[in-house]
């Protein structure tokens, strides 16, 4: 009697509010791909947004799509042209893989390629499933002292690393991080690891600010009904001078305004959080003080640095994980994330290994 084929249980969004656990066929890797047995996948705000609204901006769910892009797993099969990986390797997955070598790839900014494959961004499937295939060049071996969960958290950490690179964070900088959600916290971690001397984190939530303090914020500032200018003054008071760098992770108009007012003349503000399409900001104030305003879109060339940070214990992402669920309870996990009950909710995809 033949052994039963393993199931490929997958979490699939069909449209706004329609989330299902379904069995998909186990994919066959192409020549430059690897088949992975998934282990840990974090829930991102974008996953919840696609479930709730069926779209993010111009990216619309038009057909069933597997969610998940913060992920790690184990190689179980390699394509014919893959040489750097073999079955048994533990890997972290970079979800954005170029489909072609276009002008952006040639200059190393493949995250800007309009044709890039990106997990769980329509129409591309993600990896919240038992088995998943991916471009082998965007799967990175994990050192023995880096856990699967840490490997999955390289994705959000990469957002923080890319933001800090775009902002030019360097030794001795004073940094303002607006927002103490997962992206604000990884930006804090990245800034400290890259040499920031002092970091202040702002948020509305006392509990989130408490977590920011736990993971390394030098100062925290709870926002209530202050004006942007008043917030900027408080930030300056905490740091002793204006921060050279502001990392704006909320996308909220008043927070962006406060960030511009707070940033030191000649400094840089990076926009990580995305809010309304049109936003009113004190542009003349920024221009006359030469405050550079830069956009941040995902990341590029960050996985090797992130792995080194984790392996050397320069950053500790473990406190970010507050809840864990097996894949079979993914719907409950998403409800937990939607209600804001957890900071980072992790789904364990391997029924035989639920360890971090």
From Swiss-Prot:
Molecular function (Gene Ontology), one example: D-xylulose reductase activity
Domain of life: Eukaryota
Keyword check for Phosphoprotein: yes
Residue positions, PTM Phosphoserine: 210, 224
Keywords, comma-separated and alphabetical: Cell projection, Cilium, Flagellum, Membrane, Metal-binding, Mitochondrion, NAD, Oxidoreductase, Phosphoprotein, Zinc
Enzyme class (EC, first level): oxidoreductase
Binding-site positions, substrate: 50, 155, 298-299
Residues reported to bind NAD(+): 183, 203, 208, 272-274, 296-298
pH dependence of activity: Optimum pH is about 9 for D-sorbitol oxidation, and 7.4 for D-fructose reduction.
GO cellular component assignments: mitochondrial membrane; motile cilium
Record text on activity regulation: Inhibited in vitro by metal chelators such as EDTA and 1,10-phenanthroline.
Catalytic activity: xylitol + NAD(+) = D-xylulose + NADH + H(+); keto-D-fructose + NADH + H(+) = D-sorbitol + NAD(+); L-iditol + NAD(+) = keto-L-sorbose + NADH + H(+)
Tissue: Expressed in lens.
Binding site for Zn(2+): 44, 69-70
Function: Polyol dehydrogenase that catalyzes the reversible NAD(+)-dependent oxidation of various sugar alcohols. Is mostly active with xylitol, D-sorbitol (D-glucitol) and L-iditol as substrates, leading to the C2-oxidized products D-xylulose, D-fructose and L-sorbose, respectively. Is a key enzyme in the polyol pathway that interconverts glucose and fructose via sorbitol, which constitutes an important alternate route for glucose metabolism. May play a role in sperm motility by using sorbitol as an alternative energy source for sperm motility. Cannot use NADP(+) as the electron acceptor.
Oligomer status and interactors: Homotetramer.
Similarity section: Belongs to the zinc-containing alcohol dehydrogenase family.
Protein name: Sorbitol dehydrogenase
Organism: Bos taurus (Bovine)
Lineage: Eukaryota, Metazoa, Chordata, Craniata, Vertebrata
């Amino acid at each position: 009697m033949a052994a039963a084929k393993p199931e490929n249980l997958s979490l699939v969004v069909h449209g706004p509010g329609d989330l299902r656990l379904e069995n998909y066929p186990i994919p066959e890797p192409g020549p430059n791909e690897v088949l992975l047995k998934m282990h840990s996948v974090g829930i991102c705000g974008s996953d919840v947004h696609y479930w709730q609204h069926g779209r993010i901006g111009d990216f619309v769910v038009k057909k069933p799509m597997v969610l998940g892009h913060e992920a790690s797993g184990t190689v179980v099969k390699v394509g014919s042209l893959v040489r750097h990986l073999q079955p048994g390797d533990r890997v972290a997955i970079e979800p954005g893989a170029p489909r072609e070598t276009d002008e952006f790839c040639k200059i190393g900014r493949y995250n800007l390629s309009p044709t890039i494959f990106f997990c769980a961004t329509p129409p591309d499937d993600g990896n919240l499933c038992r088995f998943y295939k991916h471009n082998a060049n965007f799967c990175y071996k994990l050192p023995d002292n880096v856990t699967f969960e840490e490997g999955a958290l390289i994705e959000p950490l990469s957002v923080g690393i890319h933001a800090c690179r775009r902002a030019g964070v360097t030794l001795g900088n004073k940094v303002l991080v607006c927002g103490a959600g997962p992206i604000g916290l990884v930006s804090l971690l990245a800034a400290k690891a890259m040499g920031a001397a002092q970091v202040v984190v702002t948020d509305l939530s006392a509990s989130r600010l408490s977590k920011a303090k736990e993971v390394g914020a030098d100062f925290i500032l709870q926002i209530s009904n202050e004006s942007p200018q008043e917030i900027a003054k408080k930030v300056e008071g905490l740091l002793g001078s204006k921060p050279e760098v502001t990392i704006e992770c909320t996308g909220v108009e008043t927070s962006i305004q406060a960030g511009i007012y707070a940033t030191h003349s000649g400094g840089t503000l990076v926009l990580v959080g995305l809010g309304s399409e049109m936003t009113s900001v004190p542009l003349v104030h920024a221009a006359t003080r030469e405050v550079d305003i830069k956009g941040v879109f995902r990341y590029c060339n960050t996985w090797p640095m992130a792995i080194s940070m984790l392996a050397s214990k320069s950053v500790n992402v473990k406190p970010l994980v507050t809840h864990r669920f097996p894949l079979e309870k993914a719907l409950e996990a998403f409800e937990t994330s939607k209600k804001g009950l957890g900071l980072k909710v992790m789904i364990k995809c391997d029924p035989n290994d639920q360890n971090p």
